[in-house]
A protein has these predicted regions:
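Extracellular jelly-roll beta-sandwich "head" domains, especially the C-terminal globular C1q domain
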Residues: 1-157
Length: 157
């Protein structure tokens, strides 16, 4: 498991990523890496026993990271009130089924959003996962938290 957070309010422009400033639980095995001050997480697609035997597990094409994200979001001051949304993205491409949408009635009216999604990372590759503002207006994100776990691994990392 690896956990990252950002409690202070941050303004995230359309198309940009949420920045995570605190490492709550680091990944000690190198499967999840984050550059300090970045919203991008490099996930490694290591699959156990992928080249050892002819069992069904060797045919698994992806490493699955259970990715849980939660935060409070609001329309930023000075922006037009409109529906706002954030979503998980792999290598900059939004995962549509992870989109979290709210419709505030006023600026700075916070809503809690969350998603818990299985994110496939290609075997033996590394891919970048982030949380992106998919709205058409700047938003404020506060108390952001993201957790990555690998259910297929029976050891703690």
């Amino acid at each position: 498991m690896a956990e990252y957070s950002a409690n202070a309010p941050q303004t995230v422009n359309p198309g940009e990523t949420v920045i995570f400033t605190d490492v709550e639980v680091p990944c000690t095995r190198g499967f999840v890496r984050n550059r300090e001050g970045s919203g991008d997480f490099l996930l490694q697609g290591w699959v156990p026993n992928s080249n050892v035997c002819n069992c069904p597990c060797s045919n698994q094409n992806s490493a699955i990271y259970q990715t849980a994200f939660g935060a409070n979001i609001a329309v930023a001051t000075g922006s037009e009130v409109a529906p706002i949304s954030v979503a998980l993205a792999i290598n900059g491409t939004t995962i549509p089924s992870s989109t979290m949408i709210v419709t505030p009635a006023a600026v700075e009216q916070f809503f809690n959003v969350s998603v818990d999604k299985a994110v496939p990372i290609w075997r033996n590759c590394c891919q970048t996962v982030s949380v992106r503002n998919t709205s058409s207006v700047p938003i404020v994100v506060q108390n952001a938290n993201i957790v990555f776990t690998r259910p297929d691994l029976n050891v703690t990392y």
